[in-house]
């Protein structure tokens, strides 16, 4: 008798576990129910029923074969009822089970211990032939069959073939799989075939190695190409950056050059617009000394001029200062105000009538030789020359004696000086009579004494004379302010009907006054020398009109203000209104445009605000240092009261209408010197409809002055400026002819009509 081998406890513990099937349980449950039904039918005959734990279902064909085998086995066991036959059958089953176990060990090495346990159980069951033992042995047989079927199914499952298996031959792959499954005995082949397979495998390995090297080389090339592209891009970016920096430097240099050019142009304009400082004729023995003194004091000597003592050329020496700085260097003790007053005094000396006798001037200084400038002035009566910078900068000779001065009266309307005024020549003196006041004659005496040769090298005397001239000027100014409120019947101003007359008056004002160099003295000044009453008694009244040059210095060019949204819109609208109504005044047009603009919606105004932003940006790029300097509103001083232009015009209109019927008949044929001086000229800054029809006397003309750049003692006017600026609105509705010189062109600015918010 065989004894049951001792098994480890681990194996016994593992034997109680049955493998779970990876497949569904539907077919297994059907098979189990069928087998149970058959067992119960057979158990009714007195046979023991075998309950097979078929929990795993297989595909149809393997399951049917297995079930048939199990059915045959149970049938045979039921037919043979003898104990001996049962024992033999159990031994046969044990042998079969052992064979199955051996095959299972060959196919699945990992289940050797379990197979040993099953064989031990089968041996113990053979020793004990009880129905329970037989039932357990049948269950083990069924489990073994199921395990075998599972192994076959696992082998038959399609596996994902790796990449290397695609490159191998089919027979070699089958042999590898057979070797991997443990069937070493099934591998068939000779050493030659094995060597061939090994050679093929080495060839394949070499091919894979070469392919790997090619891939690595291609990857390296791609890396190098990408690195080269990145380097090229970096170089291009650096080159573009350098080009941008170079362009920026060039633009900066261009801006600097443009700035220098603008400064030079401003200096040239200042030099061309300064009135010349004139020094009279010197005797031949003093020319060398005068040239040396002029060279030391910064004067410009005309090139090619001979300074030999024996030189007797007919043209006198004329010394011209190049700039205001040269004149200041010539007289270092003078302030800018004194230099300006010196120029004004010389201009006043030029305006003396030819018939007036100048006391204090030596008679030998009035030479009979005529300078080219005076000849040119006399020729201007018949053929006036064109205006240019050279003509403006050409000096006058005070020592030249005009022709026919004794035979003609200063009050004659056919005086050549009146023709000079109307012809637009550069030299337009304003005449005066011999009945001038002693104050005016004294100032002229001082100014004429400055022209004597003795004062050339005597700096103290020149300074003293200039100081006296300044005192005379201040005294005249105080007297004029005292006489502002009085009515003077000796003033006669012609009508101002055309724009041509206005332009000629502006040209006359610029030529007579010049343009000073300092900003605080930037306003122009015109002096009208009036004398004589209706009865011939001596009297004087001086009226001044101060005009402000848009709040900037003479050396600074005017920069137009960028148009705002209203001006952009009003440019075309104004043109349309003028086409429909050519005679409509600008003030009425501005009022109409202002009311229309206020009635527009924000959506309608939007494109004009966008255009304003574009123009502002363009203006800022073109003029980065631009600063808006508005022109203050003008005021009038009438009888010691400050009045606006509209109020002044209303007062003058009422006075003129009340006095037109009171003109004496005896004065109808009297021509006043003031009227002679302004014959053919428009009245400055007076509207045409407000001037008198004839040269009738008019009440005292007040001082019309700008409130910008006034002297320090006139603080009350500055307070009015601040009040006017506070009251500024977006649309300044001014009276008629309030600002007649405003340019209403499409490209010009209109600071008085519209104020920016």
UniProtKB/Swiss-Prot annotation:
DNA-binding region(s), residue ranges: 559-627
SUPFAM superfamilies: HMG-box
Protein purpose: Transcription factor involved in chondrocytes differentiation and cartilage formation. Specifically binds the 5'-AACAAT-3' DNA motif present in enhancers and super-enhancers and promotes expression of genes important for chondrogenesis. Required for overt chondrogenesis when condensed prechondrocytes differentiate into early stage chondrocytes: sox5 and sox6 cooperatively bind with sox9 on active enhancers and super-enhancers associated with cartilage-specific genes, and thereby potentiate sox9's ability to transactivate.
Localization: Nucleus
Biased composition (Acidic residues): 730-746
Keyword Transcription: yes
Chief location category: nucleus
Biased composition (Low complexity): 399-416
InterPro entries: HMG_box_dom (IPR009071), HMG_box_dom_sf (IPR036910), SOX/SOX-like_TF (IPR051356)
GO biological process, one term: cartilage condensation
Composition skew (Polar residues), residue ranges: 119-128, 362-375, 420-436
Keywords assigned: Coiled coil, Differentiation, DNA-binding, Nucleus, Transcription, Transcription regulation
rRNA processing recorded as keyword: no
Coiled-coil segments on the chain, per record: 457-489
GO cellular component, one term: nucleus
Pfam family, one: HMG_box
Organism in which the protein naturally occurs: Xenopus laevis
Tissue expression: Expressed in migrating myoblasts during ventral body wall formation.
Molecular function GO terms recorded: DNA-binding transcription factor activity, RNA polymerase II-specific; RNA polymerase II cis-regulatory region sequence-specific DNA binding
Protein name according to UniProt: Transcription factor Sox-5
